[in-house]
From Swiss-Prot:
Gene Ontology CC entries for this record: cytoplasm
Domain remark in the UniProt entry: The N-terminal domain is an archaea-specific tRNA-editing domain that hydrolyzes incorrectly charged L-seryl-tRNA(Thr). Catalysis of tRNA editing is performed by the charged tRNA itself.
Protein name: Threonine--tRNA ligase
Gene source species: Pyrobaculum islandicum (strain DSM 4184 / JCM 9189 / GEO3)
Pfam families (alphabetical): HGTP_anticodon, tRNA-synt_2b, tRNA-Thr_ED
Length: 609
């Protein structure tokens, strides 16, 4: 922050036109015998207590030396070319004003932020009447309050016993130990080598986009099919909760000048993705903004509750460049974000039991399970400890609980569901939160049975996790299988190509096309390897591509009306097209379907570099 101090005999300011979407109330004012602080908030300045107290002490010290009876903090954007974002600058100046006001024995004023203003000043002209200063956040020391309390971690068992994580016996709970080591003891669990799943991603076209920002991906046709199938499946799973669900779409940019957006965004901190524009915009980091902005305009009765709203939100988080991980930690990703609006805490808790069941059901379909971290406020833990014990019972194992003193966030409960990956690292996938703050923040209301206006309790959840993280689990599961000596095989519903037909000669191509037509009519993704390659190479390429069903057809198969099938991980056999269709339909029942996003014939596809 750069500041110019002027000790003024008289200072007046008159508010004119708005200069920013982010602004205070337009209040004009005047002060006599005032130390006027022309303050420019710079990039990197933060509303940190230690930083602001450092500045406040200097201001008050100068004010006392010149015997000023008042102080005026005047937002002034002309002392630096490296300006902070308006929403940051306003917050810094507002908090600086509060600190100075609490410590100075005189009048303290602040001219409004975000306006063009006319001012008149009469400087005393003595040696200390004009001074300049520059302050940097890194030079400030945060003063710890004696009464400040730290988070507390406990291991809570299904029988209700509480343990200090350092004293718990983890012999039968290796996954919990990995989570505790990371969350409680802050041990770096790097895994020691490059994860195997990265090799698989190249096979299916999940790649970094080098011509974009760090942490942005691109998706080849095979990857695109998989991404969109998971998006479809997330909606199906949301509807399985047994409550009405509305699917919406919206924008990914929101104005920081909106009070609700700014206050919610402030909780997210430095990972905000800010867009350079004529107004301050942020890219959303989940679907919350759009869903809440829409639902606030709905007329809701208690009879409508509970209901859910879901959007597959393209979400943005400004992760550090060295922290981005392909398909896991990204700056841009797709989040199937479901918000469930409930009457009160009792109804939210009741619905959360079904939600918890579905979250575990879906991970178990992939052959995995979760180890759970329950972040709770101290008040919630005291009142609802038995609720957490019941969830631990349903998981059938101890859970890690982090108890936070005070109400720091909009939620009272934030559950993180982790897998332990191939390299032994906890990886957060699914989540749900119970939110008591955002309905009021965004003005979302309903009318109860007594005609009283109330704010709903909102559940936030990503049942599958983000689309990319769900696929991360799929590929990590394949890595574990291969590590155990098994042949990795994608779920049939997720396989970009479910059947590949390989004609032995050009004479068999017509029969291959007839079979492909029949399979495609039944909603099966099928392609034909019509390249001028040897049969062994075609089979090998199909196996490298993890095609679940490779069907070789020659004159004998054509005469008999059958297929010679090589099933991935399932041996070789002959079957009719009808039996193969029946088998695949059985494997994909209950899952979404998408067509092939590539030409049917391999000869028409360019190879990827």
């Amino acid at each position: 922050m750069r500041v110019l101090y002027i000790h003024a005999e008289r200072f007046t300011w008159d508010v004119k036109d708005p200069a920013s979407d982010i602004r205070d109330e337009p209040i004009s004012g005047k002060a006599n015998n005032a130390l006027v602080i022309f303050a420019t908030v710079e990039r990197g300045d933060i509303p940190d207590e230690g930083f602001l107290r450092q500045i406040a002490r200097d201001i008050i010290d100068v004010a006392n030396k010149v015997k000023a009876s008042s102080i005026v903090i005047y937002p002034y954007a002309h002392l630096s070319s490296e300006l902070a974002r308006p929403y940051v600058a306003r917050e810094v100046l507002n908090k600086l004003y509060e600190v100075v006001k609490s410590e100075f024995h005189g009048e303290v004023y602040k001219a409004p932020f975000g306006y063009y203003k006319a001012f008149e000043i009469k400087c005393f002209g003595h040696p200390l009447s004009e001074l300049s200063r520059s302050f940097k956040p890194e030079g400030a020391k945060v003063e710890k309050k004696v009464e400040e309390r730290r988070d507390v971690y406990i291991v809570l068992t299904p029988s209700g016993e509480e343990y200090n994580p350092a004293d718990f016996n983890y012999d039968k709970f290796e996954d919990l130990k990995a989570l505790v080591d990371k969350e409680v003891f802050k041990k770096e669990l790097s895994g020691g080598s490059e994860p195997r799943y990265l090799d698989y991603l190249r096979k299916f076209g999940f790649e970094w986009e080098s011509m974009s920002d760090v942490g942005h991906m691109r998706y080849a046709p095979e990857a695109t099919i998989m991404i969109e199938l998971v998006e479809d499946y997330a909606y199906m799973v949301a509807k399985s909760l047994g409550i009405p669900v509305f699917k919406i779409r919206g924008t990914n940019m929101f104005k920081l000048s909106e009070t609700a957006i700014e206050s919610h965004a402030r909780l997210f901190g430095e990972r905000l993705y800010v867009v350079e524009s004529d107004t301050d915009l942020i890219l959303r980091y989940a679907a919350c903004f759009q869903q809440f902005a829409m639902v606030k305009d709905w007329v809701i009765s208690y009879k409508h509750l509970p209901f859910g709203v879901i959007e597959i939100a393209d979400s943005y988080r400004h992760e550090q460049p060295g922290e981005t991980v392909l398909l896991f930690r990204l700056r841009r990703f797709f989040m199937p974000d479901l918000h469930i609006f409930t009457r009160d805490m009792a109804e939210a808790i009741d619905i959360s039991f079904k939600l918890h069941e579905v979250i575990f059901r879906e991970i178990e379909k992939l052959g995995r399970t979760y180890v759970s971290l329950y972040n709770v406020t101290e008040e919630f833990y005291k009142e609802y400890k038995n609720y957490l014990i019941e969830l631990a019972k349903r998981e059938g194992k101890p859970i890690l609980v982090r108890i936070l003193p005070g109400q720091k966030y909009y939620w009272v409960l934030n559950v993180e569901f982790h897998i332990i990956d191939e390299l032994g690292r906890p990886r957060e996938i699914a989540t749900f939160q119970i939110d008591i703050g955002n309905a009021k923040r965004f003005g979302i209301k309903y009318v109860d049975e007594n005609n009283q206006v109330r704010y709903p309790v909102i559940i936030h959840t990503a049942i599958l996790g983000s689309v990319e993280r769900y696929l991360y689990v799929v590929f990590d599961t394949m890595a574990k299988a291969e590590k155990a000596g098994k042949i990795p095989r994608l779920p049939t519903w997720l396989s970009p190509v479910q059947v590949r037909i390989i004609p032995i000669t050009r004479d068999n191509l017509k029969y291959a096309v007839e079979i492909a037509d029949k399979l495609e009519t039944e909603g099966i993704r099928v392609d034909i390897d019509d390249r001028d390659e040897t049969l062994s190479k075609k089979i090998r390429d199909a196996e490298v591509s993890w095609i679940p069903y490779i069907c070789v057809v020659g004159s004998k198969e054509e005469t008999e009306g059958v297929l010679s099938v090589r099933e991935r991980g399932g041996g070789q056999y002959k079957t009719t097209p009808e039996e193969l269709i029946k088998k695949i339909k059985e494997e994909t029942r209950g899952y979404p379907n998408r067509p092939l996003y590539m030409p049917r014939f391999l000869s028409q596809r360019p190879s990827r570099g």
